[in-house]
Amino acid sequence: MKPRILIVDDEARMQRLFEINLGPKYEVMTAGDGEQALEVVKSREVALLITDLKMPGMNGMTLLQEAQRIYPDLPVIIMTAYGTVEGAVQAMKEGAVDYILKPIKMEEMEILIEKTLSVRRLQDENRSLRQELQSLYGPTRIVGNHPAIQRVIQLISQVAGTKATVLVQGESGTGKEIVARAIHYQS
């Protein structure tokens, strides 16, 4: 399945340019304004949002804020013909992954898109692996209703959130390694 990229620009010519150049590698969706784009973000999974900064109605900066409120992990690239250093800094502070000036060189845009999607894939994979480790080594893997076991689970949760060094002691076969892994993977 091709990654879905949403292009938001009030110029149909720019929308078409992206469709022609990116269509072979990506599923390209277009929107003419910020309101249409938000509807797409709410209803469809989008891998990347590329938006113009200056548009009638909702501008690109507001779209960035609203889209990330709905979907915080959505990478957003802002493009503009009216670039300023202050605008770029503000966009990056708001969460844009990049801020590029028009006219756009499509080769550079394709490299930026691939880099952005690679970072997103790595973040998704990292999140998935962390969840898997949590399910394998989290405190829920330690079973028992005895107050002593419940106290161990509580202690694991307490120390895992700190930078403290922990020494786990006990006789052979008492579950020291399980406790150590639970602390490690919750840290």
Report the location of each language-model feature.
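Two-component/phosphorelay signaling modules centered on CheY-like receiver
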Residues: 12-30
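Receiver (REC) domain active-site loop signature in two-component systems and cognate sites
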Residues: 55
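A Lys-centered signature of the CheY-like receiver
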Residues: 94, 102, 145
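Conserved phosphotransfer cores of two-component systems
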Residues: 26, 42-44, 66-74, 94, ...
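Active-site residues of response regulator receiver
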Residues: 52, 80
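Acidic catalytic/metal-coordinating carboxylates
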Residues: 33-36, 59-62
